[in-house]
């Protein structure tokens, strides 16, 4: 091809270009809608301490929560949220945050592997000192998922100092927020106008046997204090 022919061909090229395609309404409807998450964050150190407080000792493996039952509960919660948002893909995400004390890796490994085997992601952090807890990591993960799109949030913890304010702020944006724990230790969640509380023992199958929680039908001979379900200050607020 001569230089003249090449120039002529390049001038004619724009005329041969096809017009840009126009995306039809039918084409738009074929796109996957934005996904949302139902996120579960489990504060393992805090809930382990709470369970130990109820039992009066360190819980055994058989006394710990069954995460397969918790996973089924989360799937049911995700289906419930999805039913209220037709056309939106809602996916569950189950996470456990824990500390690994020096020398305990071999003891904790079977538990971590069991969690991963039933679909839970585990964030493990060395327990070096008192400042190496996982509170910041849980809040950072929640913030990350919120920026990506949260359909609902479930936090299993009794740590009101760390969680109450950020969870209530998320709830005020319209995201349903639930707190899971033991009612004896979660008065801050019970008293909140924006958070829903679920007692861990009310989730079917989570515990193999009923917990030895003190009630009127199981009082020790020397008597016992029955703690309030919520603080007295809750009388100053009205639940909507």
In which residue ranges do the predicted regions lie?
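Domain-level signal for Mg2+-assisted phosphodiester chemistry and nucleotide/NA-binding surfaces
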Residues: 2-132
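Nuclease catalytic cores that cleave nucleic-acid phosphodiester bonds
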Residues: 103-239
């Amino acid at each position: 091809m001569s230089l003249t022919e090449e120039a002529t061909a390049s001038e004619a090229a724009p005329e041969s270009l096809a017009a840009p395609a126009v995306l039809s309404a039918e084409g738009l409807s074929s796109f996957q809608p934005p996904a949302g998450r139902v996120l579960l964050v489990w504060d393992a150190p805090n809930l382990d301490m709470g369970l130990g407080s109820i039992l009066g000792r360190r819980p055994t493996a058989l006394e710990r929560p069954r995460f397969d039952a918790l996973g089924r509960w989360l799937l049911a919660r995700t289906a419930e949220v999805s039913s209220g948002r037709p056309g939106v893909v809602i996916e569950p995400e189950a996470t456990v945050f824990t500390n690994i004390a020096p020398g305990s890796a071999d003891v904790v490994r079977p538990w971590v592997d069991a969690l991963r085997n039933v679909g839970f992601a585990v964030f493990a952090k060395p327990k070096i000192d008192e400042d190496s807890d996982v509170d910041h990591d849980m809040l950072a993960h929640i913030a990350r998922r919120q920026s990506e799109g949260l359909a609902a949030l479930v936090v299993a913890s009794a740590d009101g100092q760390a969680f109450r304010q950020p969870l209530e702020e998320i709830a005020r944006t319209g995201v349903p927020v639930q707190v899971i724990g033991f009612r004896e230790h979660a008065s801050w969640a019970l008293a909140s106008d924006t958070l829903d509380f679920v007692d861990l023992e009310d989730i079917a199958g989570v515990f193999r046997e009923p917990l030895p929680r003190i009630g009127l039908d199981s009082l020790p001979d020397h008597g016992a204090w029955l703690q309030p379900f919520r603080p007295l200050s809750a009388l100053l607020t009205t639940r909507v």
